[in-house]
Curated annotation (Swiss-Prot):
Residues 8-194 form the AMMECR1 domain. PANTHER family: AMME SYNDROME CANDIDATE GENE 1 PROTEIN (PTHR13016:SF0), AMMECR1 HOMOLOG (PTHR13016). InterPro entries: AMMECR1, AMMECR1_dom_sf, AMMECR1_domain, AMMECR1_N, AmmeMemoSam_A, Uncharacterised_MJ0810. Coiled coil: none annotated. This is Protein AF_1969. It comes from Archaeoglobus fulgidus (strain ATCC 49558 / DSM 4304 / JCM 9628 / NBRC 100126 / VC-16).
């Protein structure tokens, strides 16, 4: 895939996400900060928070509907305080939380017969979105690698993320794929590195 961000830009993205969270937790105000270059372009992005290796929050924008800097700030705050799976993050936790930002390519619908869909999903490269009626679910590319899924399992898990039966990809659901570029802290507040998706589970 085309590199979306340089390593330096990726570091800026992660630092911005952390700053946005901590500013919000301290002031209860959304950080007002603009960056130039790639950050002025519309991009999809997800912010993922982990604490001692466990997921602590993950929310984002699948589609490029906002400037990247705005999308990072909003997704970071939402991952910290609005993920319904978790209690809101406390400021005191931020010394134990690793911040990860995934920059997305625009999702493209996979134009294939349902039974052929797995052949169009490359594990370690593609993330998935499944839509059917009012239901929609998304899994980032790294999820399939972390949980050692094959393409069929990844499709089924994305269906279930949408609140749909696991075989919905065989029964008429729309399936979209996208790619992601991941930057994360090696340790809380530490060095920011680009992550090779294919090594996420190692």
């Amino acid at each position: 895939m085309v590199k979306l961000l340089t390593r330096e830009e990726g570091e800026k993205a992660v630092r911005l996400a952390r700053e946005a969270i901590e500013h919000y937790l301290e002031e209860r105000k959304i950080l007002q900060k603009r960056l130039d270059g790639v950050f002025s372009q519309k991009r999809g992005v997800f912010t993922t928070l982990t604490k001692h290796g466990n997921l602590r929050g993950c929310i984002g924008f699948p589609y490029p509907v906002k400037r990247l800097d705005e999308a990072i700030i909003e997704s970071a705050i939402a991952a910290a305080v609005d993920d319904p799976r978790f209690e809101p993050v406390r400021l005191s936790e931020m010394n134990e939380i690793i911040v990860e930002v995934t920059i997305l390519t625009p999702p493209e619908r996979i134009d294939a017969k349902p039974k052929d869909l797995p052949n169009h999903v490359e594990i370690g490269r593609h993330g998935l979105i499944v839509k059917m009626g009012p239901f929609s679910g998304l899994l980032l590319p790294q999820v399939a690698v972390e949980y050692n899924m094959d393409a069929e399992e990844f499709l089924s898990e994305t269906c279930m993320k949408a609140g749909l039966p696991p075989d919905c990809w065989l029964t008429g659901a729309e399936v979209y794929r996208f790619e992601g570029q991941i930057f994360k802290e090696k340790e809380p507040r530490g060095e920011v590195v680009e992550v090779d998706i294919k090594s996420c589970g190692i």
